[in-house]
């Protein structure tokens, strides 16, 4: 969950003056001591017990009951992603009627569109990062705020904000955005989420009705997409999920979650198969599934998922390197890749593609380059995923990739949102966040990590 500290500027305001939070900024939540009123035109909308946000044109707030969820006993060298959570919502599952499409994908969904630079991440940069920076670095930070990055729907309480973003995109396009803007979101709320790690355990438990709750979460996303059929929207589906079923099935939580993961993702792919949508399922990275022992079973599994969902036309392919650090291409595989011949993402997708095609799926790919600007990295092992030292912002989002298999470079992981806490006493502490190649001290997953932002900015390649 996100837990922001107020800026120094707010703390210095005169006591007789009521501070107002900027649009998209935080205005409440557990531990929040900053402004609770929004600027004109905004309303403070509660997203969960830990976070409330100023949203334009909002009229009501969403209130949730919350309970503590999620424990695990095993850690592995897998990737993890932003947006852990501890909220749970009891809802009734209902499937909305609406159009679906079947058949083969029809071209690169990024072509002819600009990706959405979401105001939420921009507000983090402007209200959390820049106030403690000066000079040239602050100017560069302002440029980062304009880079498109995905919005993470990592708890059900955030789904209503999807409509706010889609409305914002619609307005931009009606105002003549050229090229038109595409919405970019991450669907990330599986029950028993992140089954082989601790840092990003989610809000739903399989043992507590998690499958039904997840389906209600997907129904709510579908409803938002149906309200905005004119907004082209691209989704990354469930980071750190199916890849665990290849390499970490020996972990009790993963073996116990296998059927639920497959059922839930099947439901998501079918329900979100809409004319204005393109989807990419997360497929780990080359250092995870690129090994000879893993890549064949991975191709078979992903192709089966595609076919079991009735070959949805909106399912374009796979997302790789999400929240990770791998190079797109590197001349020599570094020592920390330990002999893995598919050590970079270009090698990985070109090895995976023919296997997928032979299994019945002519898939394409996108790659997260938000934190891969420094190559080789300072990882001790390619599976080290938590707040790795020495990293930098990487290739900017673009559909100009120079590779027929790669639809786009994207920033899925918002740079400087922590991968996980380094506090060994925390309930969600994962040993990877205490490794010598992890930057410390680090806050909880999803919380703003100022030192990490400054590292990414200083080492950005290309530079800002």
UniProtKB/Swiss-Prot annotation:
The keyword Secreted applies. One of its GO terms (molecular function) is cellulose 1,4-beta-cellobiosidase activity. GO terms for cellular component: extracellular region. Residues 20-55 form the CBM1 domain. PROSITE patterns: CBM1_1 (PS00562), CBM1_2 (PS51164), GLYCOSYL_HYDROL_F6_1 (PS00655), GLYCOSYL_HYDROL_F6_2 (PS00656). Coiled coil: none annotated. Pfam families: CBM_1 (PF00734), Glyco_hydro_6 (PF01341). GO terms for biological process: cellulose catabolic process. The keyword Disulfide bond applies. The biological conversion of cellulose to glucose generally requires three types of hydrolytic enzymes: (1) Endoglucanases which cut internal beta-1,4-glucosidic bonds; (2) Exocellobiohydrolases that cut the disaccharide cellobiose from the non-reducing end of the cellulose polymer chain; (3) Beta-1,4-glucosidases which hydrolyze the cellobiose and other short cello-oligosaccharides to glucose. Belongs to the glycosyl hydrolase 6 (cellulase B) family. This is Probable 1,4-beta-D-glucan cellobiohydrolase C. It comes from Aspergillus clavatus (strain ATCC 1007 / CBS 513.65 / DSM 816 / NCTC 3887 / NRRL 1 / QM 1276 / 107).
């Amino acid at each position: 969950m996100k837990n922001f500290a107020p800026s120094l500027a707010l703390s210095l305001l005169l006591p007789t003056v009521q501070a107002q939070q900027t649009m998209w900024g935080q205005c409440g939540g557990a531990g929040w001591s900053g402004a609770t009123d929004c600027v004109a035109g905004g309303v403070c909308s509660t997203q969960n017990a830990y976070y409330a946000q100023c949203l334009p044109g909002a009229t009501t707030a969403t209130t949730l009951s919350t309970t503590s969820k999620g424990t695990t006993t095993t850690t592995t060298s897998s990737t993890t992603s932003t947006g852990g959570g501890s909220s749970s919502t009891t809802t009734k599952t209902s499937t909305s009627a609406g159009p679906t499409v079947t058949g083969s994908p029809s071209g690169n969904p990024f072509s002819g569109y600009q990706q959405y630079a979401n105001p939420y991440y921009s507000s983090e940069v402007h209200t959390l990062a820049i106030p403690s920076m000066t000079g040239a670095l602050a100017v560069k930070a302002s440029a980062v705020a304009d880079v498109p990055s995905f919005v993470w729907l990592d708890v059900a309480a955030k789904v209503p904000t999807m409509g706010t973003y889609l409305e914002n995109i619609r307005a931009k396009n009606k105002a003549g955005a050229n090229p038109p803007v595409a919405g970019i979101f991450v669907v990330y709320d599986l029950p028993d989420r992140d089954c082989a790690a601790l840092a990003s355990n989610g809000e739903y438990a399989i043992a507590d009705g998690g499958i039904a709750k997840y389906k209600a979460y997907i129904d709510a996303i579908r409803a938002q997409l149906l309200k905005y059929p004119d907004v082209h929207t691209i989704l990354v589906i469930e980071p750190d999920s199916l890849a665990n079923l290849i390499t970490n099935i020996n972990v009790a939580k993963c073996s116990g979650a296998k059927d639920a993961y497959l059922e839930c993702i099947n439901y998501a792919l079918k329900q979100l198969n809409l004319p204005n949508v393109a989807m990419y399922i997360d497929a780990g990275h080359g250092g995870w599934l690129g090994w000879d022992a893993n890549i064949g079973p991975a191709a078979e599994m992903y192709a089966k998922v595609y076919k079991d969902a009735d070959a949805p036309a909106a399912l374009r392919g796979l997302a790789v390197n999400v929240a990770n650090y791998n190079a797109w291409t590197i001349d020599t595989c570094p020592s920390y890749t330990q002999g893995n011949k598919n050590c970079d993402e270009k090698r990985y997708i070109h090895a995976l593609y023919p296997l997928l095609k032979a299994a019945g799926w002519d898939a394409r790919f996108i790659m997260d380059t938000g934190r891969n600007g420094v190559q080789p990295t300072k990882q001790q092992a390619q599976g080290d995923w938590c707040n790795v030292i020495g990293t930098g912002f990487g290739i900017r989002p673009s559909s100009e990739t120079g590779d027929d298999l790669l639809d786009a470079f994207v920033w899925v992981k918002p740079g400087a949102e922590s991968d996980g806490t380094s506090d060994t006493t925390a309930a969600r502490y994962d040993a990877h966040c205490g490794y010598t190649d992890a930057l410390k001290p680090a806050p909880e997953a999803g919380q703003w990590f100022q030192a990490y932002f400054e590292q990414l900015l200083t080492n950005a390649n290309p530079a800002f």
